[in-house]
Design a protein with these regions (language model features):
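Structured helix-beta-strand junction loops
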Residues: 12-14, 57-58
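Metal-dependent phosphoester-hydrolase catalytic domains
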Residues: 27-159
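Acidic/histidine-rich, metal-coordinating catalytic segments
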Residues: 13-28, 32
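A long, amphipathic alpha-helix that forms part
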Residues: 1-13
Length: 159
């Protein structure tokens, strides 16, 4: 099972942080259209259950905690202009224990970094834990996103 090597996180220090490209969209709100992902990876019940087990040891999804109702993505397929249509998914996560989550001043996904020539298909996920000397604590509003896609209106390029 996915979790067995990782269960020591729950018995380790409370200030644990687990982050990276986990390739799991935690909920349907983390993909542009849940219907487009039926039968695909990243959204299966088994994957989501494994992620929920990891979070159950006391880890907070700090980006979703900061932007609970916002459409924020960290990955867009290169094919079919998915980025420019904002047809993405949020599969890059920062999960933090209580002491770290309490220090989060700002958390966001830098969509601008995904633009330009030769970018990664992922955008950086950034968390500010402390206020900078100049008072900067990151964006107070999430980067603008397109409106929610009508369910079933778009297909994945590989579908």
């Amino acid at each position: 099972m996915f979790m067995s090597p990782h269960t020591t996180v729950g018995s380790g220090p409370a200030a644990a942080v687990v982050c990276g490209d986990v390739n799991i969209a935690p909920t349907d709100a983390d993909v542009f259209d849940p219907d487009a992902y039926i039968g695909q990876t990243h959204v299966t019940p088994r994957e989501r259950e494994a992620l929920a087990e990891l979070q159950a040891v006391g880890l907070h999804d700090v980006v979703r905690d900061r932007w609970p109702g916002e459409r924020v993505f960290s990955y867009w397929d290169y094919r079919a202009g998915m980025f420019h249509q904002d047809l993405g998914m949020r599969i890059d996560l920062i999960l933090a224990g209580d002491p770290v989550a309490a220090r989060v001043q700002a958390a966001w996904i830098d969509r601008q970094a995904r633009k330009g020539k030769g970018p990664s298909d992922h955008a950086p996920v950034i968390v500010d834990l402390d206020e900078a000397p100049d008072g900067d604590i990151g964006p107070m509003v999430p980067p603008p996103s397109n409106p929610v896609t009508r369910r079933g209106a778009k297909k994945l390029p590989q579908a």
